[in-house]
Amino acid sequence: MVAVELVGVPFDGYGRSGHQAVAAAALRGSGLGAALAAYEVTERDAMVLPTGSRERGTQTSLINEPALLAMTEEVGSRVTTAVTGGRFPLVYGADCSTLLGTIPALRADGPVSLLFVDGHEDTMPLDVSEDGEAANTELGLLLGLSGQLMQGPLSERLPALGRDELAVLGPRDRGWRQQFNVGSLRDSGVWMRDWQEVAAVPEDLARSAVDHLKQNARRWWLHVDLDVLDPEQFPAQGLPDVADEPHGLTWDQLTRALTAAVARGGCIGWSLAIYDPDQDPDRSDAQRIVRLVADIMTALPATAL
């Protein structure tokens, strides 16, 4: 039986109260624990972070820097403790910046690859980022494409990922990136398939992605940004006052892709990000996320490797 360690992250990348900062609590309240009843589940004391700030920080130039730095440190510690103890960490809530804690911490214990499932490539350079949100930049920081002028403890752990240790499924942000003259990782040698390709053959491409990752490391981490979904399928993504990128995967396509990926073996943990309970008053989206978790965990082999 897989032993699961839940890691709820009460962080909002814009420093807001509510929104993504309460996503973990909303998912717990919508039956996340019950969905994992077939597993041995542990969860440590609730994570406590500094009060959110909407100012850019002096070390990273990113918004909500004090909470970001504390969060990445805590997430990294909890994830590595879980993996070392033979448990499967499920990091839930917050945004994609949790990867700035997870990947460097895992890297310290040996090679690790990343399957990144997201509607955006998240490689916005720090000097180009118009809003200073870490979750627009984290993949570029992990790869060392940006962040050379950062200071402090986070900068000391970066870069932490090679281009051949990354596979990306689902982006649909070409138009947005072009506004800032930011190229695609696909053009620089990263294994990537966009949302239309994934929608056509989700299982095949997910398996191919994992096979690519396992050429470079036996262990790989799964990260899912739920904005890979079509906003008509999942409205509680993005910012309340900003139009979401149209199109994206259906729940069925995402489930099929993730199920095929984890069934391939080698997945040592999973982060699930970008859910805004403030845009989900009846919690129907939260309940759908919980169903996704249950479906994917069922496909996980009894041993991670």
Feature annotation, model-predicted:
Residues 2-90, 102, 184-305:
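Catalytic cores of soluble, metal-dependent hydrolases
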Residues 7, 94, 117-119, 169, ...:
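Active-site flanking residues adjacent to catalytic metal/cofactor-binding acidic residues
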Residues 84-156, 161-165, 264-265:
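Active-site histidine-anchored catalytic micro-motif
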Residues 124, 175-177, 278-279:
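Active-site environment of divalent metal-dependent phosphoester hydrolases
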Residues 163-165, 173-175, 216-220:
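Aromatic-lined glycan-binding groove of carbohydrate-active enzymes
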Residues 116-119, 143, 165-173, 194-196, ...:
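Short, structured patches in soluble enzyme cores that scaffold and shape functional sites
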Residues 150, 170-177, 249-254:
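A general structural motif
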